[in-house]
Amino acid sequence: MTIQDKNTTTGELSYFETTLLLYLKESHPHIADAKALVRARADEAAGSYERAIRDGLSVTQALELADAVLYQDLRFSRFDTVFEVVSEWFPEVRPEKRADFCLKVLSPAETVFSKYPIDDRFESSPACHTLTVELTGFIQSYIEQYGV
């Protein structure tokens, strides 16, 4: 497996840039256009991969190390959490409007998210359930105040 770590002369994205960009578009759309972040993380991940291969690790192990660098502090997605809450509890937000609504409510919902120590392991913590309950109430109030 060849992993391209630099942009080609044709302007194509590297494997790590493409992988991260697709993930950001799906789970962190509010930062998907952060080109400097994508470039820096892709470069770091490629470097990690290359060092791991030089150190004799398998391709699978090297990719695991590179992924740890690529997705650091991005594993928990505020957008995905809002989207799941809206999908489960708010049928008045039609499926075709759901992503746009979630993007709209994401910034105001930061008042809820900021109360929690969110990191890559947060989703498996007991506090995640509490956040989800609080977020549901916040979104209900938001809809009552501003509508869908």
Language-model segment annotations:
Residues 2-148:
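C-terminal alpha-helical interaction appendages
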